[in-house]
């Protein structure tokens, strides 16, 4: 009867669960972290280390977090945690953007606009309460993601202290000469009733009318003469323009030409029976005339744009308004006619060229901009013939104007086109340029543009193309419109002279005095402030500004209002946001930082892509392809979500689907199972008593420590350059190849069959201990919950959380004089592969069942054979085969052959050995197993 030797084996045993059961375990861990004050402990533990500050770009305090939020916060968390392990003090202060239009809209839906049910102060209070509620909801979900930070003391742009610091930041901008006021065309949303910043604009397709309009020359003969032509009697001359905004024609004050463009004087369509010649850019003449129904291009002269400068035209429907021909750099021969109608109240370039020619001083505000904040023509807008424009909305006016121009002779062509057009990012409605009195941070007045472009060069951009992208945006951007005509925000707390409109000469001093009061009572203090308290007798000559600051200024000055305020260094080490923030937070922070300190507020900028489905489509409710982070955490757990984010190439669009999540769940299981196998074999191991020194280890164990050392160097470097996908790939490869397919398989024999305290067994356990200690650190920034769980099961004393530790210091490379070098192991592992290939057909044809049933012969050149023969007795353990013989042969190649063994099988270790039955007390055991049970035990040097 076969004796049961199971009790003599040391099989794996651990209480570390096979299943992660993350949706249940993670919330319990979160509760423990909160209870123990994990973040405060982390800060105390890191005290005195070098600082690494990742400054949080604030999400908007409105609505539930979505997948993009999760990507952003988890990427930040991975970096912060990896910096902790790298020996830094890495504080993380989360923040929220709390002012602005979306919150106003939410309150308006409930209470109506300001003045309906609530006065301005009550309205602001409701906004404050709403934002605070939204922060609480978002904070709960961010914590659930496993993101560690100062959640009890975040920064909020609605906090009185922040609002005060923002006003102090404005004082610095004013002090450095960057603030200006003027009537300039700005992006205007009629639904918001306010100016918009560049970052608040998004582009979408829109169908617009296109019209070609003729501007008749006041002196046709003089125009013809400029072309070297003589005008026949009764022939008129006109300059046609092409536009997609007919509603701007009432504000048309000039026509711009290109100075060096070539123009031709050509025969055009008759004007109500009268012959007419047209001035068109030569490159566009044929195409334009075709639109007007003229097939043949008959040219009467050539001229450069410079020859026509300051000649006068008539407005197409306001005959009394003379229209000068100006020269502008913005005019090209790409499309249209080469002549651009110029309405300085409705376009940046129009404004600049009109200002250059002194045109703005000739007209009143209502002529420059006849459109009010709702998009309606002012009462003073002159009619178009019998057609009343006053009170008409501009989007309706397009068709009305076109209809009214039929039959007047000036409408040469009309059509429609679909094109990309700026829309309000909140309302998704088309916006317009509209000249209004606004406050600006000038890009030129104190060299802000040049200084910002220089500062960009000092920053390390991830990916590298981010540098060219933001530089191009800064180089071409207009002045920053920082004023808004809204209620919920931080006031531009300036006093302006009632007659001159100039800010008070002591503005920076006054701003700081206002800030001190706001810090105590919030922004309402400004609106209730009696100017005489600060200005004394001068109060009668000054008005308080009621505009508020752009929310991008709110978030843009967090480097001052948060970092400096909390004693953290500036510039921050890293800003990390989505790729849209080159025109948003990265840029507003850069401009405010340079305006205040002549330096970028960050050393590094990292951007991530947007989330899309597996087909590359944007996720949306209408497509039904959206995946919410809350759902992932409920079904799979936060660590699966975190693993997907780490494994994705975040520099591009990040694809997610249920299938992708399933693959990441499978990857998680492989990593968890590896950890569990390590822990199972560390049962009964105490590093204080049993740890075998590296130099005394079995060489295979020493090799796996070497491989772990190589991997850790790779992982640490990848964390430092934010390449998390490489880390995940390297970890999975190490677990499946180095450990799963080789080391863990080979060492089972030693771990299970040797005496519990045998050196060979303790050597394997020591190697596994080193690997486990390193492994828990490697995964901690990504799989934070699992790492914390694993940390609690490791042998030895482990206090607190793995993040209190640093990268593991117990690993080391194989020394150059090792009995087996890394190169030796590479050759042996190649030989192992060769053996496996020889055994495969033997298994397939039934010659053997398992590799242990095959005896192996290796024939190699003399030198290689001499190197391997001392290992021959133990090679069977590396190959997990029967006995191995190494012979020398006169060949440069290595030959492997195998034959089924005839030796008996040991029932305990399953090896086929001639010594089975040699001990009558254990007739079914090999001599090695007998020694391991009752004798001194076997010795192992190599494997």
From Swiss-Prot:
PANTHER family: ISOLEUCINE--TRNA LIGASE, MITOCHONDRIAL (PTHR42765:SF1), SOLEUCYL-TRNA SYNTHETASE (PTHR42765)
Subcellular location: Cytoplasm
UniProt-recorded Gene Ontology molecular function terms: aminoacyl-tRNA deacylase activity; ATP binding; isoleucine-tRNA ligase activity; tRNA binding; zinc ion binding
Biological process terms in GO annotation: isoleucyl-tRNA aminoacylation
Keyword Metal-binding part of the UniProt annotation: yes
Cofactor details (free text): Binds 1 zinc ion per subunit.
Catalytic activity: tRNA(Ile) + L-isoleucine + ATP = L-isoleucyl-tRNA(Ile) + AMP + diphosphate
Entry-linked HAMAP family: Ile_tRNA_synth_type1
Keywords: Aminoacyl-tRNA synthetase, ATP-binding, Cytoplasm, Ligase, Metal-binding, Nucleotide-binding, Protein biosynthesis, Zinc
Notes on the domains: IleRS has two distinct active sites: one for aminoacylation and one for editing. The misactivated valine is translocated from the active site to the editing site, which sterically excludes the correctly activated isoleucine. The single editing site contains two valyl binding pockets, one specific for each substrate (Val-AMP or Val-tRNA(Ile)).
Gene for this chain: ileS
Binding locations of Zn(2+): 906, 909, 926, 929
The name this protein goes by in its record: Isoleucine--tRNA ligase
UniProt xrefs under InterPro entries: aa-tRNA-synth_I_CS, aa-tRNA-synth_Ia, Anticodon_Ile_BEm, Ile-tRNA-ligase, Ile-tRNA-ligase_type1, Ile-tRNA_ligase, M/V/L/I-tRNA-synth_anticd-bd, Rossmann-like_a/b/a_fold
Entry function: Catalyzes the attachment of isoleucine to tRNA(Ile). As IleRS can inadvertently accommodate and process structurally similar amino acids such as valine, to avoid such errors it has two additional distinct tRNA(Ile)-dependent editing activities. One activity is designated as 'pretransfer' editing and involves the hydrolysis of activated Val-AMP. The other activity is designated 'posttransfer' editing and involves deacylation of mischarged Val-tRNA(Ile).
Subunit structure: Monomer.
Record-listed L-isoleucyl-5'-AMP binding positions: 577
Keyword Lipid metabolism: no
Stated family: Belongs to the class-I aminoacyl-tRNA synthetase family. IleS type 1 subfamily.
Pfam families, per database record: Anticodon_1, tRNA-synt_1, zf-FPG_IleRS
Principal localisation: cytoplasm
Motif ('HIGH' region): 59-69
Positions contributing to ATP binding: 621
């Amino acid at each position: 009867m076969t004796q049961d030797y199971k009790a003599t084996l040391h099989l794996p045993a651990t209480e570390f669960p096979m299943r992660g059961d993350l949706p249940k375990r993670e919330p319990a861990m979160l509760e423990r972290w909160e209870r123990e004050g994990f973040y405060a402990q982390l800060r105390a533990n890191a005290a005195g280390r070098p600082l690494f500050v990742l400054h949080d770009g604030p999400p908007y305090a409105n609505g539930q977090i979505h997948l993009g939020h999760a990507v952003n916060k988890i990427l930040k968390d991975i970096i912060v945690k990896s910096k902790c392990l790298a020996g830094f003090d890495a504080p993380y202060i989360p923040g929220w953007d709390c002012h602005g239009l979306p919150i106003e809209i939410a309150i308006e839906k409930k209470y109506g606009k300001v003045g309906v049910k609530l006065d301005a102060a009550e309205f602001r209070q409701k906004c404050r309460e709403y934002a605070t509620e939204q922060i609480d909801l978002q904070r709960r979900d961010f914590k659930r993601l496993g993101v560690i930070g100062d959640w009890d003391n975040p920064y909020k742009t609605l906090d009185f202290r922040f609002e005060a610091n923002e006003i102090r930041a404005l004082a610095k901008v004013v002090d450095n000469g960057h603030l200006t006021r003027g009537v300039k065309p700005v992006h205007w949303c009629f639904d918001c009733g306010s100016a918009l910043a560049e970052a608040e604009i998004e582009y979408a397709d829109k169908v617009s009318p296109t019209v070609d309009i003729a501007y008749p020359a006041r002196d046709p003969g003089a125009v013809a003469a400029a072309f070297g032509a003589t005008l026949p009697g009764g022939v008129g001359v006109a300059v046609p323009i092409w536009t997609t905004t007919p509603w701007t024609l009432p504000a048309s004050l000039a026509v711009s030409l290109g100075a060096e463009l070539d123009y031709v004087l050509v025969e055009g369509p008759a004007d109500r029976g009268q012959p007419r010649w047209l001035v068109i850019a030569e490159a566009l003449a044929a195409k334009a005339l075709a639109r007007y129904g003229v097939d043949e291009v008959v040219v009467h002269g050539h001229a450069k744009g410079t020859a026509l400068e300051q000649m006068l035209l008539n407005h197409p429907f306001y005959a009394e308004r003379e229209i000068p021909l100006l020269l502008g750099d913005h005019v090209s021969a790409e499309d249209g006619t080469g002549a651009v109608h110029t309405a300085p109240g409705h376009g940046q370039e129009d404004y600049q060229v009109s200002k250059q020619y002194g045109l703005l001083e000739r007209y009143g505000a209502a002529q420059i901009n006849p459109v009010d904040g709702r998009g309606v023509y002012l009462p003073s807008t002159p009619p178009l013939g019998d057609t009343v424009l006053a009170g008409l909305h501009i989007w309706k006016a397009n068709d009305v104007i076109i209809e009214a121009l039929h039959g007047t002779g000036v409408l040469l062509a009309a059509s429609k086109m679909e094109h990309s057009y700026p829309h309000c990012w909140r309302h998704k409605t088309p916006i317009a340029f509209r000249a209004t009195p606004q406050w600006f941070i000038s890009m030129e007045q104190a060299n802000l543009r040049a200084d910002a472009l220089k500062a960009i060069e000092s920053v390390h951009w991830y990916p590298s193309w981010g540098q060219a992208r933001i530089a191009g945006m800064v180089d071409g951007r207009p002045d920053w419109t920082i004023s808004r005509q809204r209620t919920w925000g931080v006031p531009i707390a300036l006093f302006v002279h009632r007659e001159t409109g100039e800010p008070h000469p002591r503005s920076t001093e006054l701003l700081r005095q206002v800030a001190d009061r706001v810090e105590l009572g919030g922004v309402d203090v400004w609106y209730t402030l009696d100017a005489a308290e600060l200005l004394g007798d001068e109060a009668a000559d000054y008005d308080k500004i009621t505009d508020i600051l752009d929310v991008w200024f709110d978030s843009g000055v967090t480097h001052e209002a948060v970092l400096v305020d909390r004693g953290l260094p500036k510039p921050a080490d890293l800003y990390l946001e989505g790729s849209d923030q080159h025109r948003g937070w990265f840029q507003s922070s850069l401009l405010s930082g340079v305006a205040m300190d002549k330096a970028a507020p960050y050393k590094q900028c990292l951007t991530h892509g947007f989330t899309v489905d597996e087909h590359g489509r944007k996720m949306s409710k209408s497509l039904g392809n959206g995946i919410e982070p809350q759902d992932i955490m409920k079904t799979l757990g936060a660590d699966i979500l975190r693993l997907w984010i780490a494994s994705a190439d975040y520099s591009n669009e990040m694809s997610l689907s249920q299938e992708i999540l399933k693959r990441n769940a499978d990857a998680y299981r492989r990593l968890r199972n590896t950890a569990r196998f390590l822990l199972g074999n560390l049962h009964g191991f105490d590093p204080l008593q049993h740890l075998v020194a590296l130099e005394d280890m079995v060489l295979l164990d020493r090799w796996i420590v070497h491989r772990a050392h190589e991997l850790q160097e790779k992982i640490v470097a990848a964390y430092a350059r934010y390449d998390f996908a490489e880390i995940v790939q390297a970890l999975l490869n190490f677990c499946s190849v180095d450990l799963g397919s080789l080391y863990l398989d080979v060492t089972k024999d030693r771990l299970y069959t040797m005496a519990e305290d045998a050196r060979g067994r303790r050597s394997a356990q020591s190697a596994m201990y080193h690997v486990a200690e390193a492994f828990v650190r490697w995964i901690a920034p990504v799989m934070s919950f699992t790492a914390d769980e694993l940390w609690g099961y490791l042998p030895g004393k482990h206090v607190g959380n793995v993040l209190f530790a640093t990268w593991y210091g117990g690993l080391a490379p194989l020394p150059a004089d090792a009995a087996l070098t890394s190169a030796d192991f590479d050759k042996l592992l190649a030989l192992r592969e060769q053996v496996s290939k020889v055994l495969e057909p033997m298994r397939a044809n039934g010659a053997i069942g398992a590799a242990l049933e095959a005896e192996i012969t290796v024939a190699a050149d003399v030198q290689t054979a001499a190197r391997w023969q001392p290992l021959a007795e133990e090679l069977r353990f590396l190959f997990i085969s029967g006995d191995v013989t190494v012979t020398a042969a006169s060949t440069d190649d290595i030959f492997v052959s195998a034959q089924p063994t005839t030796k008996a099988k040991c029932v305990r270790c399953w090896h086929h050995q001639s010594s089975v039955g040699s001990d009558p007390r254990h007739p079914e055991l090999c001599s090695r197993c007998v020694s391991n049970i009752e004798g001194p035990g076997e010795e192992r040097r190599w494997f």
